[in-house]
Amino acid sequence: MVLLYRSQRLFTIDKICATIFTGFNNNLYTNHILKEFIYFMQITFPSYYKKFSCIADACPDTCCAGWQIMIDDKSLSKYRHFQGSFRNRLHNDINWKEHAFRQYGHRCAFLNEENLCDMYIEAGSGMLCDTCRRYPRHIEEFEGMREISLSLSCPEAARIILSQKDPVTFRTFEKETAEETYEDFDYFLFSALMDTRDYLLTVLQDRNVPVRYRMAKLLVCTHDFQLAVNKQELFSWETIRARHEQSGFSSAFRKKISGRCFPDMDRVDLMKQIWKTIVPKLEVLSPDWTVFLKDTLISLYHTCPEETSYMELLLDFQDTFPEWQIQKEQLLVYWLYTYFCGAVYDEKIFAKGKMAVICTLFIEELVLGLYARKREKPEPGELVSVCYRFSRELEHSDQNLNTLEELLDQEEVFSLEHLMTLCSI
């Protein structure tokens, strides 16, 4: 089965061979080939992917604390039948009902005082489950395709992502694999999502345009894409997307964006409302996170209680730290690449676009809070800390990811008009 990308149509090798060998139906070699099937998997990853190497005990944090590490079925079976000297501890420190490692003080039961893994030390690397072996490598699965990224929740991965100066590119290769079938996988929608994401990545990486307009284009495109799907008019989206591409970032587009803002809603008030809408609904994975979030936002909003002082701080921050615009771009690209095409499973296209913008703006607000304290450019380590801590609270919890998406999809505060206000500067 050969995957023809972009259209996502599947053809068997017998159909291809039938075309190639037309007129040679009596050829025994040809008849043999026609009975064979070849399946290929397409694997995509960002250009910085291979730069990652675990820094072990030099890491400022551990990847084995603050979240419940789920165990895949194959590893669980391996642990159940393990006969070595490590067997008793292995069996005692696994929650067999939940298929997860037990935690003590929010730390994995196998994490020792040196922040190293006792399972790795005592039983070897072959005993690690899929999650522990792959992390921070994150995999999104689609039929005939895997998309790999480095999770922002890892300090070293966050450092790599933030340090990219050039626009990120994505590399793809194929490998022969076993056949797989996903029930009810919508290839037409997936093809439209892939094509649209390609276009939106180009939009987000257009450095001739201020980031705020790039975010606005992302939002209006995903909004219109969602409308087409809701109306069951997916066939019309290609034409609509072409109009978005043609309009670019013209003065007419910028004027239209300004006209979609709510005139009675200041950015600072809107951001406060968004924090209040989301934070109470999310589970807290690290006790330190609540303290950090409260202290940082108090620094920001007490220093700048009104729109005028807030905007002055934001403009001062942008002047002092111009390279943030590139890092902001890298974050937008990270969120969009990782989650957008997952809309093939739930059709929440606009919510995925909102997620890229809101998560990036959340991180920006926290960085701005740090800036409000010192009025000097944040250190690279401070930026990394904000990014990976935010990511851990969100991406290490399926419950939090699902809750955020539901809020983005349903709450009025996340309407297009409100979000255009956030793109006004």
Where on the chain are the PLM-derived regions?
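Polybasic, low-complexity association/targeting segments
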Residues: Y48-W96
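Hydrophobic, aromatic-lined core segments that form the binding pocket/scaffold
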Residues: V209-I425
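Internal, well-ordered alpha/beta segment that forms a basic, Gly-enriched binding/recognition surface
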Residues: N115, A123-D224
